[in-house]
């Protein structure tokens, strides 16, 4: 019988969740849903010194906003609770002791000063990587070098100690990664990692392996930065005798800077003017409020689609996928090895596509919510007409107000550069003449307005394209905007006449 798919997203609550972490959560989620498996949220808070208040709730809120819903976790519970590692502390102790008894780990009593002296000694000897390993452990203060009676006495006396993994000397660790294929590592390059700290709390390495075993995790899908830790984790599985139930490893390619060189960081995001966090983060240390993708106006479904394609390819030309379609198409085999450039323009494109696919009724909420705040009167039909006009240019929900407010509020300023280029004496006189015929246009709709304007200009041998920018400046204050005739129809006959007359009164023709 094939092993059930059970995957976990296991972030540490040490600050705001990076967008790369969201992609990791998403890939785990997609694999679980694809195979009717279980997606687990486990909080890895073994490093209490780095714990940041609010970070755990931030992780929960992020997944909730994106619809990446855990089947088991700190809120949902489940058959392998608790799902917070600090609540599992006593259990890790038992497994650490088991390794010591099996000769796979040992007690180490070295003080920070002694550890520093060891590193200095190795550096002086020109050792490339000064570390606590199979060679240096021989002259350190641990249960491999001290008599058993002394070890027992030190422990009974309450002397601080850690439990270290006894790294095999000069062996080859081979394991298969679903993305990278076979990986080989020489153990002489690895150190004797601490498994249990002096405060009795397990380190990430021990807790991670024990929990993955106990929670029956089938696949460990995580970032490439954890690849160097994989050999130790393989050796821990072997030390416990758990090789037969060891999960498959999947190390995801890193997200690169927009330029393509180096790992994406908050500094890079700030430099290019885009967020690095999924939702807003209030830094408890500094009080700084940092906006996330949500606050910038990215739709959760668009962000999911964008992130899914950062490292995974469905094959073919299709780019737009609902979450359900992603589940159906997803496979580990199509995850690439190479780092992926974080292209914010592509993220914007996805957001734009998802907005365009919404109905005018759905989009109108983005506009009417702002109108309601400002107590500006409108009709439902009017709001939907405006959204239909604006949607092709909108990238974010807030664009519907930013581009739609001009339909309700006359411009208070006019584009000086556009005036300098367009507002000649002839244009001024022509506009004044057009204003005079506006009251006669009936019905007052885009087609009639355009026809009347064309006839009016034809009599004066003026091209319509010469006057359109002038009318737009008078009506909206700028030369950019949605279809002009439809805009005039929505703004209405009376308000259009008022705006054009105001502009004629305020704007002085060039050269006058």
From Swiss-Prot:
* Chain span(s) of sequence motif 'HIGH' region: 11-21
Q: Which reaction(s) are listed as its catalytic activity?
A: tRNA(Glu) + L-glutamate + ATP = L-glutamyl-tRNA(Glu) + AMP + diphosphate
Q: Name one GO biological process term.
A: glutamyl-tRNA aminoacylation
Instruction: Quote one Gene Ontology molecular function term.
Output: glutamate-tRNA ligase activity
Concerning InterPro entries, the annotation shows:
aa-tRNA-synth_I_cd-bd, aa-tRNA-synth_I_codon-bd_sub2, aa-tRNA-synth_I_CS, aa_tRNA-synth_I_cd-bd_sf, Glu-tRNA-ligase_bac/mito, Glu/Gln-tRNA-synth, Glu/Gln-tRNA-synth_Ib_cat-dom, Glu_tRNA_lig_a-bdl
Write down the superkingdom of origin. Answer: Bacteria
Q: What class of enzyme is it?
A: ligase
Q: Which GO terms describe its cellular component?
A: cytosol
Q: Give the record's family classification.
A: Belongs to the class-I aminoacyl-tRNA synthetase family. Glutamate--tRNA ligase type 1 subfamily.
Its biological purpose: Catalyzes the attachment of glutamate to tRNA(Glu) in a two-step reaction: glutamate is first activated by ATP to form Glu-AMP and then transferred to the acceptor end of tRNA(Glu).
Please identify the protein, giving its name as recorded. Glutamate--tRNA ligase
Its source organism is Amoebophilus asiaticus (strain 5a2)
């Amino acid at each position: 019988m094939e092993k059930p798919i059970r995957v976990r997203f296991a972030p540490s609550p040490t600050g705001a969740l990076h967008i790369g972490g969201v992609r990791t959560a998403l890939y785990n989620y997609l694999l679980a849903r694809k195979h009717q498996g279980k997606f687990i949220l486990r909080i890895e808070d073994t490093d209490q010194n780095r714990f940041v208040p609010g970070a755990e709730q931030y992780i929960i809120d992020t997944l909730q906003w994106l619809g990446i819903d855990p089947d088991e976790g700190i809120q949902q519970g489940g058959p392998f609770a608790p799902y917070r590692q600090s609540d599992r502390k006593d259990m890790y102790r038992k497994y650490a002791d088991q390794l010591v008894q099996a000769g796979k780990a040992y007690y180490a009593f070295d003080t920070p000063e002694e550890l520093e002296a060891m590193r200095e000694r190795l550096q002086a000897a020109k050792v490339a990587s000064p570390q606590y390993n199979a060679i240096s452990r021989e002259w350190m203060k641990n249960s491999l070098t001290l008599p058993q009676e002394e070890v027992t006495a030190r422990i009974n006396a309450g002397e601080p100690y850690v439990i270290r993994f006894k790294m095999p000397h000069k062996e080859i660790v081979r394991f298969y990664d679903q993305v990278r294929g076979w990986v080989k590592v020489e153990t002489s390059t690895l150190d004797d990692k601490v498994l249990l700290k002096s405060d009795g709390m397990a380190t990430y390495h021990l807790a991670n392996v024990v929990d993955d075993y106990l929670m029956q995790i089938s696949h460990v899908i995580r970032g490439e930065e954890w690849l160097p830790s994989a050999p130790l984790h393989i050796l821990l599985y072997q030390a416990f005798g758990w090789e037969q139930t060891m999960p498959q490893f999947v190390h995801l390619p890193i997200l690169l800077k927009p330029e393509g060189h180096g790992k994406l960081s908050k500094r890079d995001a700030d430099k290019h003017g885009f967020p690095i966090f999924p939702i807003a983060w209030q830094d408890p240390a500094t009080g700084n409020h940092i906006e996330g993708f949500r606050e910038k106006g990215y739709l959760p479904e668009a962000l999911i689609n964008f992130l899914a394609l950062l490292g995974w390819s469905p094959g073919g030309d299709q780019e737009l996928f609902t979450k359900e379609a992603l589940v159906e198409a997803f496979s580990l085999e199509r995850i690439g090895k190479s780092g992926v450039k974080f292209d914010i323009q592509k993220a914007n494109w996805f957001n734009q596509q998802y907005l365009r696919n919404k109905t005018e009724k759905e989009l109108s909420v983005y506009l009417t919510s702002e109108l309601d705040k400002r107590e500006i009167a409108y009709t439902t039909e009017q709001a939907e007409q405006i959204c239909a006009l604006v949607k092709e240019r909108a990238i974010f929900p807030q664009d519907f107000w930013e581009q739609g407010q001009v339909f309700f509020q006359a411009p208070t300023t006019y584009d000086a550069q556009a005036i300098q280029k367009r507002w000649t004496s002839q244009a001024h006189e022509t506009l004044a003449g057009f204003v005079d015929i506006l009251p006669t246009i009936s019905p007052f709709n885009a087609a009639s307005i355009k026809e009347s304007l064309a006839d009016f200009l034809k009599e004066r041998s003026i091209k319509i394209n010469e006057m359109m920018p002038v009318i737009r400046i008078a009506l909206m204050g700028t030369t950019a905007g949605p279809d002009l005739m439809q805009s005039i129809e929505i703004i209405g006959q009376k308000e259009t006449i008022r705006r054009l007359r105001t502009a004629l009164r305020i704007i002085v023709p060039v050269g006058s």
